[in-house]
Structure formats: C-alpha cells, structure tokens
Amino acid sequence: MKTVMATGTFDIIHPGHGFFLEEARKLGGEDARLVVVLARDSTVRARKRTPIVGEKQRLEVVRMLKPVDEAYLGSETDMFEIVHRIKPDIIAIGPDQKFDVDELRDELRRRGLGCEVRRIEKYRDAELDSTCKIIKRIRSMEFDEDSLKNC
C-alpha cells in the first residue's frame, strides 16, 4: 500500500479541494492511503492571508472528507518534520501552491526522504473553484438585515 501525502490550507472547502484530494489519492493506486497535512493558521497568515476558518475546524472538516484516511496539522517551524513522521511514497502538491517541484524534490533528498513529488492540475469545472474567488464573491454582494436575520 502506498501512502500519498497531500498538503494545503483547505479554507472554505470547495470543489477544487475535493478534486485535489481525489486526484492525490489516485496517485497511490487502488489501495492508497491518503494523509492530508493542513497548514497552521500562523503559516497561512505569513504566506497568504488570515484564514477565514481556524485550523482546528479546517482539520475537523478535512477529516470528514471521503478520500481522506488521516489528517494532521503541520508544523509551525519545519514543514519537513511531519514528512519524516508520515514517510509518504508520494507528495501531492496543489496547483496554487508556490512550491517548485524540482526544488522540493531536491530538499527532500537532502533530508533523506526519497518520495516522489507530483503537482495536481487545477479543477476547472466550477465557477467558484478557489477560496479567493469565494471571498471576492461574498465581498461583492450586498446584504440587508432581512437577508441576514437567520444567520
């Protein structure tokens, strides 16, 4: 059985996340084990923006998703720490993640981690296929008190 590790923020779950996780799992074959590592809130703030959903809730939601066998929060100091613990055969990188696959592969080798690194293509079958698009849509909408009374 091959272990595939997928990483990401997973803030405001959308179809792109589901596609990424399904495709990541497929990389390991029929009996693959998919382990998801979520970026910590502090990491997201440093690299992107303040997450809408906190790390504990994001972790809880990801653990509920069908393709996922296990999910953990990543390290706040060394992103390779959890890779040593999980020992994946394959690391799946999302289309919007800012990693250079070759550089990541080289760093993994330097650290004695000989796993394969693969980038998953972008999901394009939904209008709202990214958290940023969802945030922009919400910000562009006008809400009155009546429409928010049941929130």
From Swiss-Prot:
Pathway the protein contributes to: Cofactor biosynthesis; FAD biosynthesis; FAD from FMN: step 1/1
The record, for CDD domains, names: cytidylyltransferase
Q: Which reaction does it catalyse?
A: FMN + ATP + H(+) = FAD + diphosphate
Q: Could you tell me which InterPro entries the record lists for this protein?
A: Archaeal_FAD_synthase, Cyt_trans-like, FAD_synth_RibL, Rossmann-like_a/b/a_fold
Q: What is its EC number?
A: 2.7.7.2
Nucleotidyltransferase found in the keyword field: yes
Query: Mind listing the GO molecular function terms for this protein?
Result: ATP binding; FMN adenylyltransferase activity
Which residues are ATP-binding? 9-10, 14-17, 96, 123
SUPFAM superfamilies in UniProt: Nucleotidylyl transferase
Q: Which coenzymes or cofactors are required? A: a divalent metal cation
List this protein's GO terms for biological process.
Answer: FAD biosynthetic process; FMN metabolic process
- What is the top EC class of this enzyme, as a single word? transferase
The keyword Flavoprotein is annotated on this UniProt entry: yes
* UniProt family annotation: Belongs to the archaeal FAD synthase family.
The record ties this protein, via NCBIfam families, to: cyt_tran_rel
State the oligomer form and interacting partners. Homodimer.
Relate the protein's function as given in its record.
Catalyzes the transfer of the AMP portion of ATP to flavin mononucleotide (FMN) to produce flavin adenine dinucleotide (FAD) coenzyme.
Q: What is this protein called?
A: FAD synthase
Taxonomic source organism: Methanothermobacter thermautotrophicus (strain ATCC 29096 / DSM 1053 / JCM 10044 / NBRC 100330 / Delta H) (Methanobacterium thermoautotrophicum)
